[in-house]
UniProtKB/Swiss-Prot annotation:
The lineage of its organism: Eukaryota, Metazoa, Chordata, Craniata, Vertebrata. The keyword Cell division does not apply. GO terms for cellular component: endoplasmic reticulum membrane. Belongs to the SecY/SEC61-alpha family. This is Protein transport protein Sec61 subunit alpha. It comes from Bovichtus variegatus. One of its GO terms (biological process) is protein transport. It is a multi-pass membrane protein.
Amino acid sequence: MGIKFLEFIKPFCAVLPEIQKPERKIQFREKVLWTAITLFIFLVCCQIPLFGIMSSDSADPFYWMRVILASNRGTLMELGIAPIVTSGLIMQLLAGAKIIEVGDTPKDRALFNGAQKLFGMIITIGQAIVYVMTGMYGDPSEMGAGICLLIIIQLFVAGLIVLLLDELLQKGYGLGSGISLFIATNICETIVWKAFGPTTVNTGRGTEFEGAIIALFHLLATRTDKVRALREAFYRQNLPNLMNLIATVFVFAVVIYFQGFRVDLPIKSARYRGQYNTYPIKLFYTSNIPIILQSALVSNLYVISQMLSTRFSGNFLVNLLGTWSDATTSGPARAYPVAGLCYYLSPPESFGSVLDDPVHAVIYIVFMLGSCAFFSKTWIEVSGSSAKDVAKQLKEQQMVMRGHRETSMVHELNRYIPTAAAFGGLCIGGLSVMADFLGAIGSGTGILLAVTIIYQYFEIFVKEQSEVGSMGALLF
């Protein structure tokens, strides 16, 4: 059935826009240039407002997910990377459940990637229609069919640009992937803004700066009671405070520490005697993939819940899925779940919220740990990183594990890789929960993604430098 499905979509994949693989080795400085160009295009799209929208001031149901999904409300990047990640989630679940089978051949892998791109484009159109028809930009009946269609076209073209930018980097023209680059940029931008944002907000305590560090100096300079000023700077509510910033730095340090955990399996050359090496199996074997897929799952659940609650607010089943309320605190208008499944799958707002509703906290922890472990375990099967795939790669490189024959390598690798994938996913989920409870800036998931992505870029840089030999030769 799997091969039939891939063969069925083959004609559609042939007409999709595609980035050709480079015909020569791309130098590091060229990769840096292409990466910078890709990032520049993304940031420009984040600032260009959608033409034709009547209003984007209503409560934002995806406020909590925007940092993770690299989206910016009311702009061309309204959808962010959500369509790409959602299509990856769907294809992974289909492959993991054996509904479709992906072979080891390059042809099957190419068809699988093509199917993922096709689904990404379909999801982009679907999400654009949902956003417009649920009134996120104004009443569709007042805007008219022409304006609604124009907004949908803008969102689709922007989504296609994101798909192609991601493929550009994935094909080897740049560093890393577009998804990782956009997420890390968005999260780092949020952290810097929450720390140094110069905008002022009128609160019950008076006018305060949004940035936690600027607010510290402002409070110390304007308040006569310095001890109370320090207390406010560290613990103020509804605005970034210094404890949030300290929690963010702490989570950064913990994740970087865990990045170093790995098991080195001794391998040797089957051709040349005396040539030994090691194959590292990291604790975060699947890196940040589990948390990205988990975020995609939750964000799509939010989309469906918001769409249904807008149309059928009194329905019992709709309320069971999620009941939403608009935030009454200072800051941007946002909607948040107050009951139903969406509420229990959303992180508690603070440690105080954990004490107020421990059932919510327990369900959220179980969901995070379970979903991350599941996605991590299934991802290795469809991404070419399972024990069978690793054994095949070592065999192609004429390497064998010391003390084991070629035939027993898969069995030995199976002792480590699935365990590392599941336990690593569990740790990723646990660290995300810890960051949420500590109140880290940008959400626990966002911080975790930022650290793992920055670490990936650090590893890429070190690898490129070791191949060239010196820093000067790498950049000039």
